Amino acid sequence: DNINRLYKNLGNGTFEDVSVASGSGIAVNAMTTTLGDYNNDGWFDIYITNTQSSQAGNGNVLLMNNADGTFTNVAEETGTTFNSFAWGAVFLDADNDTLLDLYVSGGFDGSIGSFLSAAFYHQQNDGTFVIPQNIGFENDTRKSYSNAIGDINNDGKPDIIVCNDIENNFLWENKTVNENNWLKVKLEGVISNRDGIGNTIEISIDGESQYRYTLAGEGYLSQNSFYEFFGTGTATEIDFIKVTWTATGTTETINNVDVNQAIIIKEGSGILSNTDIQTDNFFSMYPNPSNNGIFKLSISDNERVSLQIFDLSGRLVTKKDDLRNNDEIDVSHYHKGIYVAKISSGSNISSIKLLVN
């Protein structure tokens, strides 16, 4: 058979083919996939692009996650079939209204009948999508293969870069004008990978949540900015941000966050300020791995600091204040394994991994 495959990670180094059981085994000439929780229900949906010549039909596929291990193709109902030779695709909240929109690149140049060259789908309040007119994409008539989002001018509105076939690439600057607010979040792993790939971010405003998942590659030949974009509508404060670090299964929650800012959340350290980023290596602990259950503290400035050490479950195992350079930390009672040490002094915050043998 020629269906596409969904493999479930069993958590033990093996995978199980759940294509048929999940309803995701769609027989299309898949060119790219992208993930996004388009209906903000906490379950990630899958968008699959398709070629015009596919024997299984000409449309793209939007697999809505049913939250029970199955998916339903809702491309027709939502108006996102595209019905052309599709390549790259990306979800984005272009107008920061809290609803994810969708941009699709195509392999036709717009001169062949009704076949689209590209499409920007704007999500409506009822979960359907429309292609708005006269918003700047009228000249988006090139054969293109891939696209990605970022923020070239740091105004909180996602811009789109498009890789065209022969012609120069397109950079679509987002010039949306409205009163909506935004938040950008970048994850920095300590035990997890540094780029935060594979981890989930939830924000909540007045009981309504949005979710993002940092991908390693975005569809065909693309990589989005590692800053995840959230549109917050007219809200001026976010009740909480919750990060789930997949490598350890731990969660980290930050309450009462202002909008209209870009933040970095470092695993085990919370939000990093500009000072945090610039002084990220102001301390170390040695020898690492520990020698006879003792770490020594090395601080670039001879100032007093506070120390917290967490295990991989996120449990605080040691807390010490008023420490100075060359102070010793006894970890002889620790179980063998990896820990995270967090040092803070005034506005300086930094974290490192510790290995206890």
Set out the residue ranges of the language-model regions.
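Hydrophobic beta-strand segments that make up the repeating blades of beta-propeller
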Residues: 1, 46-51, 102-106, 159-164, ...
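Beta-propeller blade termini
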Residues: 8, 21, 30-40, 49, ...
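Gly/Ser/Thr/Pro-enriched helix-cap/hinge segments flanking short amphipathic alpha-helices
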Residues: 110-113, 128-279
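Hydrophobic loop/turn residues within beta-sheet-rich immunoglobulin-like superfamily modules
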Residues: 38, 94, 152, 233, ...
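Beta-strand-rich extracellular modules
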Residues: 49, 244-248, 342-346
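Short, solvent-exposed loop/turn segments at conserved positions within beta-propeller repeat blades
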Residues: 1-2, 53-58, 111-116, 167
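C-terminal outer-membrane/trafficking sorting elements
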Residues: 206-210, 277-357
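Blade-edge motifs of beta-propeller repeat domains
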Residues: 7-28, 59, 63-84, 110, ...
